């Protein structure tokens, strides 16, 4: 599959000079993961920060894309609420799910929280043809809402 990868940080916001379209291996679902074909991906400030390498540096090489939507094409064995064919959008806060903040429903306060496509290392972001996330980090979108919306 194709992915937009960078191995260096942009100088003077020259993002074109660092981005390269490459072939990479398709993800395989872990028990709690969903795999989806990316239909739309947005550019937000986390992606810009990642490509700049500041204020926080992402691990390199890197695939950004903190916001993506698409169609589910595979699921892990433990996935319960998402099925192949569902239309989903990413929810990029990856948290531990076991600390007090997480169990109280405040995942945004998790001290181990990471942002998908920004600081999750091998859990690449959505600037690729096929992406993966834990089931808890996707939300179904209704048929009357486009992927771009």
Q: What are the language-model segments listed below?
A:
Residues 1-2:
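Extreme N-terminal starter segment of soluble prokaryotic enzymes
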Residues 7-12, 41-43:
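Short polar catalytic/cofactor-binding loops
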Residues 14-25:
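Short glycine/threonine/proline-enriched tight-turn/helix- or strand-capping micro-motif at secondary-structure
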Residues 25-42, 54-103, 124, 132, ...:
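Glycine-rich beta-strand-centered segment in the early N-terminal region that forms part
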Residues 45-52:
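Cytochrome P450 core scaffold surrounding the K-helix E-X-X-R motif
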Residues 103-121:
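Iron-sulfur (Fe-S) cluster-binding segments and ferredoxin-like electron-carrier domains
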Residues 149:
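C-terminal boundary of histidine-terminating zinc-finger modules
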